[in-house]
């Protein structure tokens, strides 16, 4: 199967725009279709890879919800919060936890040109207290 030069150039241009300095860390998403929707959003925004903390070590996505995004966004599975945070910080990422507390600040007040990781909590409970204590900044 051959690919038309115009289509090849378009695919190449999209892949060249992927942002390796932007990622997300998702903590214990309960429903696979929600993780799939996050991957689809990452793909649309040009995020190169996403990170997931799963205590059960089972990462499931729904193809119908992800619409093929799982092929283009690398999904890194972390066994626990500590290894996830260590890995991202060792790669130079600053972690912004999406939670509303007394220390949260408006997300629009930051320069995101450096390595940035948005940390998202589970649908029912949001971020765990353990993870909130490890992020660099809470944002809303």
Indicate residue ranges for each PLM-predicted region.
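Post-transcriptional modification and biogenesis factors for structured RNAs
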Residues: 1-140
């Amino acid at each position: 199967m051959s690919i038309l030069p115009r289509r090849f150039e378009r695919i190449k241009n999209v892949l060249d725009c992927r942002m390796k300095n932007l990622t997300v860390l998702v903590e214990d998403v309960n429903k696979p279709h929600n993780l799939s929707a996050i991957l689809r959003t990452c793909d649309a925004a040009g995020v190169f890879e996403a990170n997931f903390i799963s205590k059960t070590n089972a990462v499931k996505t729904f193809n119908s919800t992800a619409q093929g995004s799982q092929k283009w966004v690398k999904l890194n599975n972390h066994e626990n919060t500590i290894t996830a945070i260590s890995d991202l910080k060792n790669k130079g990422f600053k972690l912004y936890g999406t939670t509303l507390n007394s220390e949260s600040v408006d997300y629009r007040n930051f320069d995101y040109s450096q390595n940035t990781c948005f940390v998202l909590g589970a649908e029912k409970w949001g971020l765990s207290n353990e993870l909130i204590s490890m992020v660099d900044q809470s944002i809303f």
